[in-house]
Curated annotation (Swiss-Prot):
GO MF term list: magnesium ion transmembrane transporter activity
Organism: Arabidopsis thaliana (Mouse-ear cress)
InterPro entries tied to this protein: MRS2-like
Protein name: Putative inactive magnesium transporter MRS2-8
Keyword terms, alphabetized: Coiled coil
Keyword Transcription: no
Length: 294
């Protein structure tokens, strides 16, 4: 360095501290929030390590984490925090998020008496489900549908490409097949991560019990709950914590469950299995197509 040379300060790249969020409550009302991460942490009562897995600038595998007052979802383009009263979705420019936001607004409204927004008056189970479970159901249906559609899209492209390569072996046709196989390999990994999350949750009743946010809120006034046990709701690892599924449970029942019923997860388990099997079928389908590509 020359003696008279001035030192030029180097701008450090720091983690993003303020994100844009979309809040959707039980009435379907949407609100855009541009707030500091500490505001979000205080609002939903989660640790910094939990919020970190939603950082769009960092890579974290798919995760579904149950916490004391919230459920943290990192499902590809769907990055959300669900509480018993609202869902906070990280705003992004990903066009795949648009239909998911619309579905959240439609399905989370307490006035929506039928599944999927149909107001025929015959199906009222959605109104009786806890808010957090309706939100979880929307998120998991959205990601599973997205991955299934992507699988079909690649599968439809793969077979014609293989036929072209069989008829005429050219570098162009070979490159096309290689690109398709690469895309299928990435998709397989994405599908498997979701499948693994659901499977791990199914294997642990305590993890599934963590998902009843409304149940825990209802029991918060109990001396047994207020005695300091709430610390245990924060698992040590952000990736091993409670996993969540597409879940529905009657709100009235959840609000009146006693402490000795806290591990009653039969309804959650049945709903979780439905998503697990659907996702496993998708996993097998994309695997078959990948093997065909060689």
């Amino acid at each position: 360095m020359l003696p008279n040379e001035e030192l030029v300060p180097v701008k450090r790249i720091t983690p993003q501290s303020s994100w844009s969020w979309i809040s959707i409550d039980a009435t379907g009302k949407k609100t855009v929030l541009d707030v500091d991460k500490y505001v979000i942490m205080h609002r939903v009562q989660i640790h910094a390590r939990d919020l970190r897995i939603l950082d769009p600038n960092l890579f974290y595998p798919s995760a579904i984490l149950g916490r004391e007052r919230a459920i943290v979802l990192n499902l590809e383009h769907i990055k959300a925090i669900i509480t018993a009263k609202e869902v906070l979705i990280q705003d992004s420019s990903d066009e795949n998020l648009i239909p998911t936001l619309e579905e959240f607004q439609t399905r989370l409204s307490v006035g929506n008496k039928a599944h999927g927004g149909q107001l025929d008056g015959d199906v009222v189970e959605e109104d009786e489900s806890a808010f957090e479970f309706r939100a979880l159901e929307v998120a998991l249906e959205a990601i599973c549908s997205f991955l299934a559609a992507r699988t079909i899209e690649l599968e439809k492209s793969a077979y014609p490409a293989l036929d072209e390569l069989t008829l005429k072996l050219t570098s162009r046709n070979l490159l096309r097949v290689c690109k398709l196989k690469s895309s299928m390999t990435r998709l397989t990994a994405q599908v498997q991560k979701i499948k693994d999350e659901l499977e791990q949750l199914l294997e642990d009743d305590e993890d599934m019990a963590e998902l009843y946010l409304s149940r825990k809120l209802a029991g918060a006034s109990s001396p047994a709950i207020d005695s300091g046990e709430h610390i245990n709701w924060y698992p040590t690892s952000p990736t091993i914590g409670a996993k969540i599924s597409r879940a529905k449970s009657h709100l009235v029942r959840s609000a009146t469950v006693r402490g000795d019923d806290k591990n009653d997860v039969e309804e959650v388990e049945m709903l979780l299995e439905a998503h697990f099997y659907a996702n496993r079928q998708n996993f097998e389908q994309i695997n078959r197509a990948t093997r065909v590509c060689g």
